[in-house]
Amino acid sequence: MASVFSSLRRSLKGLLVLIPVLIGLAVTSPAQAAQWDAETLTVPADPSGTEVTFSDREIDSGRKVFNTSCGTCHAGGITKTNHNVGLDPETLALATPARDNVEALVDYMKDPTSYDGEYSIADLHPSMRDAELYPAMRDLDDEDLRLMAGYILVSPKVQGSAWGGGKIYF
């Protein structure tokens, strides 16, 4: 009987040592732990190739705005309503006009067009053009759009092919 209690006591001591470690892991999120280098945070600003470097804080703010305003349909960089068109770098670059820079993404969020750029889809896709139709866009300003664009462009550098890769990564 004494050996059972001795064994139980050793097990409990082991758990007591492990609990602070587990709490520390639970409290520290990857976003808090991430300190990305300038190369990771640097993305194309416009079609001419000019670059802009975002701060960690700006990317975190962009992530929050994106998740609140766009995350329902674009979680993880996918497009739930059209799995052929995601937010991965290749798809953004092949759009017409290309949407692989901050300026183009902001322009798209203001007045979205079809993937081939032939017609407006503002009546179907949330945008600033009709914030009454899409209330999630109502309170966003140009700075919010810029931060979301930064987040969209930095995400594949951090998450790799999982960003825009679809359900196989979830």
Curated annotation (Swiss-Prot):
Keywords tagged on the record: Electron transport, Heme, Iron, Membrane, Metal-binding, Photosynthesis, Photosystem II, Signal, Thylakoid, Transport
Names of required cofactors: heme c
Bilayer disposition of the protein: Peripheral membrane protein
One BP annotation, GO: photosynthesis, light reaction
MF-aspect GO terms: electron transfer activity; heme binding; iron ion binding
Binding annotation for heme c: 70, 73-74, 125
Cofactor binding annotation: Binds 1 heme c group covalently per subunit.
Signal peptide: 1-33
This protein's GO CC annotations: photosystem II; plasma membrane-derived thylakoid membrane
InterPro entries referenced in this protein's UniProt entry, alphabetically: Cyt_c-like_dom, Cyt_c-like_dom_sf, Cytochrom_C550, PsbV_cyt_c550, PsbV_cyt_c550-like
Purpose of the protein: One of the extrinsic, lumenal subunits of photosystem II (PSII). PSII is a light-driven water plastoquinone oxidoreductase, using light energy to abstract electrons from H(2)O, generating a proton gradient subsequently used for ATP formation. The extrinsic proteins stabilize the structure of photosystem II oxygen-evolving complex (OEC), the ion environment of oxygen evolution and protect the OEC against heat-induced inactivation. Low-potential cytochrome c that plays a role in the OEC of PSII.
Quaternary structure, from the entry: PSII is composed of 1 copy each of membrane proteins PsbA, PsbB, PsbC, PsbD, PsbE, PsbF, PsbH, PsbI, PsbJ, PsbK, PsbL, PsbM, PsbT, PsbX, PsbY, PsbZ, Psb30/Ycf12, peripheral proteins PsbO, CyanoQ (PsbQ), PsbU, PsbV and a large number of cofactors. It forms dimeric complexes.
Family indicated by similarity: Belongs to the cytochrome c family. PsbV subfamily.
HAMAP family referenced in this protein's UniProt entry, alphabetically: PSII_Cyt550
Protein name per Swiss-Prot or TrEMBL: Photosystem II extrinsic protein V
Species, as recorded: Synechococcus sp. (strain CC9605)
